[in-house]
Amino acid sequence: MSHSACPKPATARHSQALTGEIRIPGDKSISHRSFMFGGLASGKTRITGLLEGEDVINTGRAMQAMGARIRKEGDVWIINGVGNGCLLQPEAPLDFGNAGTGARLTMGLVGTYDMKTSFIGDASLSKRPMGRVLNPLREMGVQVEAAEGDRMPLTLIGPRTANPIAYRVPMASAQVKSAVLLAGLNTPGVTTVIEPVMTRDHTEKMLQGFGADLTVETDKDGVRHIRIVGQGKLTGQTIDVPGDPSSTAFPLVAALLVEGSDVTIRNVLMNPTRTGLILTLQEMGADIEIIDPRLAGGEDVADLRVRASKLKGVVVPPERAPSMIDEYPVLAIAASFAEGETVMDGLDELRVKESDRLAAVARGLEANGVDCTEGEMSLTVRGRPGGKGLGGGTVATHLDHRIAMSFLVMGLASEKPVTVDDSTMIATSFPEFMGMMAGLGAKIAESGAE
């Protein structure tokens, strides 16, 4: 799916107070896994609150291509799964569009099957490195035919019987951890993942919920040992997907920056591996009230009331990066309006996202008058309270939905408008973004729609 074929620029202008109550679309990580585990489990899985962005739908299509039956009735997705170990060889390559999570997790899921599976994606996904997932699969006996640098398009040829491995994850990556655990589902014996730095743990929680024999132990040094016994039975479940914290970040930061704003965001996932942004903003002085914290489907959920706040710069501890890796672009926007300097470090993962996200953010900030310094793995932003003199630039989004949404948020509070060169790809993660922001009072218009 090529987004660049017909780009839709959009411009955000200085807005009056944002007010109202919103419910954020379902969490992307949990939505991908709901389709995957539901498609793999025996019996019926029912999902409400699913994020219906293109990325997640592509994961659903991949599961259908391997035998799962998926349909929608009203607001509920109903999946009849094939049963663990019973995926079918797809007749055509699996097309993941822009979905890095869907592609990498599915590589783990199918790699250990005695079959041939091909993966393709859009221009952006085809540039992203897949070796980090392919290397442990190779250790399990999977043969890989890939484009140069272990990139897509690629084909996996599974072994007759996979070898269980103990794999130490070399970087903080939930996708690598998850791919190995999913490969372990169809592997005899015990597959172990050793995780020195904890990352989002939806795969572990959800697999346990579906009945997998999976245990997690944390040693005295904080290193997690996750063990899964292969070839067990998974059983269909009922899932209500909580709101995505990474999508929540955009209206949340907008409400903090636009003077006089008071916005309530309902049903937000508050899993501790995902709340780094909220913690950081609170340290900067953000007025974020956490209302009715509760458990839903084994996950922490709460409502957030966010009021406009005067922010001050902070140093963000690098070890917090895994819990907010997708939120750094919008944190950089918040930092642009804060008093003093904000230092973000440990950002090497941002270099291999949908774009080189670190460079894209730095260029976008510079184009809009922000004083910032880009390091190899760091970004330092010196803010201008009230957004005085900020804006007036056009941002190259590089087909990256989070860059587009972050800079549209900037334009709502900066003195001059901010334009992004394309907004079509926002649909990959947050199709309702434009309408939801407009409902709160944000002035965002697609070019030509003035």
UniProtKB/Swiss-Prot annotation:
Alphabetized InterPro entries for the sequence: Enolpyruvate_Tfrase_dom, Enolpyruvate_Tfrase_sf, EPSP_synthase, EPSP_synthase_CS, RNA3'P_cycl/enolpyr_Trfase_a/b
Organism domain of life: Bacteria
Gene Ontology MF terms in the entry: 3-phosphoshikimate 1-carboxyvinyltransferase activity
Keyword list, A-Z: Amino-acid biosynthesis, Aromatic amino acid biosynthesis, Cytoplasm, Transferase
GO CC annotation terms, alphabetical: cytoplasm
Listed CDD domains: EPSP_synthase (cd01556)
EC number: 2.5.1.19
Reactions catalysed: 3-phosphoshikimate + phosphoenolpyruvate = 5-O-(1-carboxyvinyl)-3-phosphoshikimate + phosphate
Residues that coordinate or bind phosphoenolpyruvate: 28, 100, 128, 175, 357, 402
Principal location listed in the UniProt entry: cytoplasm
Subcellular locations according to the entry: Cytoplasm
Catalytic residues (UniProt): 326 (proton acceptor)
Protein role: Catalyzes the transfer of the enolpyruvyl moiety of phosphoenolpyruvate (PEP) to the 5-hydroxyl of shikimate-3-phosphate (S3P) to produce enolpyruvyl shikimate-3-phosphate and inorganic phosphate.
Subunit structure as annotated in this protein's UniProt entry: Monomer.
Family per record: Belongs to the EPSP synthase family.
Protein name stated in the entry: 3-phosphoshikimate 1-carboxyvinyltransferase
Organism: Brucella canis (strain ATCC 23365 / NCTC 10854 / RM-666)
Taxonomy of the source species: Bacteria, Pseudomonadati, Pseudomonadota, Alphaproteobacteria, Hyphomicrobiales
